[in-house]
Amino acid sequence: MSYPTDPEFASVEITSRHSNLRTETRSGRTQVRSLGAQRRAIKGRYNDLKRSEFAPVFAFVMAQKGGVEEFTIVPPVVSSSSGGAVGTMRTNGSHTAGDSTITVDGFSGLIKAGDFVKFGNHDKVYMVTADQSGAGTLNIQPGLVEAVANNEVITYNSVPFTVRLENDIQEWSLSGFDRYNFEIDLIEVL
């Protein structure tokens, strides 16, 4: 199931959450240990929607039963490559879970640092951490959460994030005459 694309959000906020343990000694020395998990939170805001625009969005949200159901969302603007890449990007060789350098081919143009990508065999979305022009090594973070096989398709335009509602309580406000304001908080499903 896909989140409605119309109307578009007035604003989108994407947050990266890493699972780390952090301790600080009395002398001020800090130790940090990564638990290896990373996921994104997405906050979308709508301002001044007419009832005819708002009703289908809120009906979709209600159908998710709070945080029970999973669905996909393609955030506007940031879900597509900013470097003008074309073609079908694929893995060139297999890669194991934890790898953050992925050999790729099958496309031309540029994938830029900050672009999002998704591998065809699982739902996790990754961020590119260094520009890559055509075949070569794609640097991503976090490291792969699942192994990928040779020739696995990598989506870099209209990247779908698999999410659920972060909160079980959803509320909206009505301002002026028939103008709805609504904010939705989503969390990436791992």
Describe the predicted segments one by one:
Residues 1-190:
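Extracellular/virion structural assembly segments
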